[in-house]
Amino acid sequence: MAFLQTWLADYQIPLTLAVIVFALVMFVLEWLPIDTTAILVAVILMVLGLVTPTEGIAGFSNSATVTIMAMFILSYGITRTGIIQIIRDSLIKFGGDSLRRQLLLMGFIVGPSSAFLNNTAIVAIFLPIIEEWARQRQISVSKLLIPLSYATILGGMITLLGTSTNILASGLAEKLTGQGFSIFQFTPLGLLTFSVGLIYIVLAAPILLPARRNISDGNVAAEYQIKDYVSEIIIPPRSSLIGQTLRQSEIQRKFDIDVLEIIHNDTHFPQPLADRVLTMGDILLVRAGREDLLRIKDERGIEILADVQFVSAETNNAGPLESSEEKVAEVLILSNSRLIGSTLKDLRFRQRYNATVIAIRRGEELIRQRLGKVRLKFGDLLLLQGPRESFLGLQTTRELLVLEEKPLDNLRLDKAKTAIAIVALVIVIAGLDILPISVTSWAGVMAMVISGCLKPGEIYGAIRWDVIFLLAGLIPLGTAMENSGTTAWFASFLADAGGHLSGYALLLLFYLATALLTEILSNNATVVLMLPIAFQVAQSLGLNPLAFMFVVTFAASNSFMSPIGYQTNTMVYGPGGYRFTDFARIGAPLTVILTLATPLLVMLIYGVQPTN
């Protein structure tokens, strides 16, 4: 054992590099959820002795992690009071019919909101709003949703509180220099990059983004091609199904079929249907492919009626799938959902939510068969049919997002001014350095609970636990890199290789390397790896470390070229009906513009030479 400990001590840098490579591979291949991978990395570091047990679990009590937890809760408290909806209603009327004017207006609404609230929360609020906006103004939603995501990303860089990456970077900076970033230290650079990015979006989006998905007529049946796989079958006199309940018949388990409704003597019976006894003459509205319909006809003696006649687009509904009791709606799987990685069959989705999935949209792909065997992913868009009260229940979950506007009577509008005052006090007190943001943010949480803006039980559901576990696992990796000398080794190599370059060139290279890395890793993982290296390179070359840390922080968050580089990109991937290449088409030029502009702006605002 002593020999093993000695060997491990002698090879700390190679071992740390091996763990980094392992983490990179696991993040890219996604064999495990990234938050699980991060915790696994922390465990490996402790087992190898690269961090002590205390250091290995320190991520859970790190000031950045604690602050981010509080900011999730404060963001949720703000959204529960309907403030964003109030701002939306007061400004949306100025949108007009010009697409560029609408993009500019959306940027002005979303950007400042993202500066203080969680980005994913902003997109979750605005997704159904933008869809309805597109429908009313006869615009393809594909022209608006990537700009929505980009605007939240850019707006999140205006203040320290805008993203978890900013707060994590501040925690790393405090560890390296003894002082973290102040709340508004990002603001001069953030406002400029936001302005540059918004101008690009307004000019380029109408040209570069295709009209992939048009929901202007509201005809869900036509968009999802429901007519091709929703049919009516009737139970004839000699069918073996007569006298059995739907559960006993096992037709939904044995065949790729979902029964959406049973019609008995002209009376429509919605879900739940499992214990409904089937009788002669019953008509079943089913989701099924032709092959399965023919199989059930042969084996169970049913008859297939003529294709379901869906109503015209002018009626703005899905025909027989919708009624006064039932409806059809799209539901988005969010990043913290327990559904991710599971199949509908494993989840017993129909029984759990009292609704049936009749199609899945994944980007441009439309999945309509063998739905029970499809492993669900973050960003999948489910087309659900079920009782209207089931959707009211779905609107309260934090794992799924129903893409329709929530009624204002579900919000605590009377607490809006109180919530604004609480968040303003949190920002002012922390901004004046009276108390650390980790303290003021939790004081704000308690104030929201005491004032009734939040209920105590809502605190736990408001926290994005996947992000918290990701941070808790990544922070020990940064510690291991420092303890083992890996950060210093990287910095020495880069300083020797780039010592002859100008300050602008070095900043540009760090921005580019970080921006490319964040497209395949999470932005938090990228900042943990790159920020300490950038800091030590700056110190080695006698340059301003703050400039290098800001370049890395901004580059880590500005992920525009893929739907997987940033969570808000993934959230709009399905609803926009995008292809993977759509993000590269509009995101690559924006990345180039910011790669050239951000280092220059950093030099002008903060200087590349140390200020002493």
From Swiss-Prot:
Pfam family, one: CitMHS
Location in or out of the cell: Cell membrane
Gene Ontology MF: a single term: monoatomic cation transmembrane transporter activity
One GO CC term on file: plasma membrane
Principal location: membrane
TM stretches of this protein: 13-33, 38-58, 67-87, 107-127, 144-164, 189-209, 419-439, 459-479, 501-521, 525-545, 546-566, 586-606
Keyword Membrane: yes
Protein name: Uncharacterized transporter sll0640
